[in-house]
Amino acid sequence: MDIDFEEEKLKSLQISSLSEEDDEGGAPNNDAEDADSDEIDDEEDQIPMTLGFAEKPKNPWSSRRQYFPSKAGGSPAWLDPINLPSGSSSLCDFCSEPLQFLLQVYAPLPEESAFHRTLFVFMCSSMSCLLRDQHEQWKRSPEVQSRSIKVFRCQLSRANPFYSSEAPAEDGSQQPLTAGAMLCDWCRAWKGDKICSSCRRVRYCSGKHQAAHWRSSSSSHKVLCQQLGASGKESELAASNSLWPEYEITCEDECDFDEAVSNDNGSGNALVSRSRTEGSDGNLLKYFKASDENSSWASFQERISSAPEQVLRYSSSSQAKPLWPVFSGRPSKPDIPRCNHCGGTRSFEFQVLPQILYFFHVKDGEDSLDWATIAVYTCEASCEGGASYKEEFVWVQLSSQSISHQ
């Protein structure tokens, strides 16, 4: 990928220096806990991280579920294609709109029960709901959180009813062992258990998506409903044009980029140019050391500058920590709830960076999505049993600029 992250494009993503931003309001004061997390942050430098990059799909079949993809945008490739999350799990808890698919990460573990394992992230496309979400994520048990962003973990053993126990052939010929659930024709994400009463051919996950499909100017079901009913054919209508464009997520070890940068003093794609990081003090962090917010931002910039196109940071180590762009608004250990399935500890597994909004062509509008980082915490035991899709915990850090724009 060859992407020019010049200053103008960064501003469109609302990624900017924090030197002119006001402190975030509404978050509890966790100064003591933040001090503890600062000590741990130094350890994060020693833990290997895997970076994820958004690439256009190399072929039309690689994002199908039988190839166990990591992907962003488009529609999810459900691991268990039958027993999908349903009911309120699929909805934004604020506006009740069905959540939109953000990305999925294929992250198998050595345990047999997690031979196949994928994490799915969904979120409401409304920034207003994400702002309301900020207050909710600070709630601690037994208070119930309302969320506009949710993550689900699904895992399967090697022997399972859906896929062959052998590795899939890399030629597009691989087929799943069973068909999946019928999905909503509009979002292609959630189970389509509602059917158009007129043509009896088109399925929806909700009345909201049925209404959206009916009103759509680009692929209105109102126009073709009678034609489908008369023909007896299944729906071939395009999904919603509001879905984010689909990308494969390819992975590289961060250390490979660090070595490349150490051998090359210049980096044309760096978010922070080499001339800016090597000032009179010799280090951007020293330049910004007077301010916690600026220091945190500078550390974030410096860390990602070797691979500025990264959209995801992943680690299988339970000792790994997120790379926080903002000093305030970080969770402490008590803010991360225990697994609500087995009661075990949750730890950080991956984070989603705002660079992905560039690939999704998200504009800088009044209610446009923006975040500093999205950190996903999962059950350390990756517990099995119970529901096929277990909801995990996600923490969203916003920049104060995101808040002030609303």
What are these regions (language model features)?
Residues 1-406:
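Preference for intrinsically disordered or flexible, low-complexity segments
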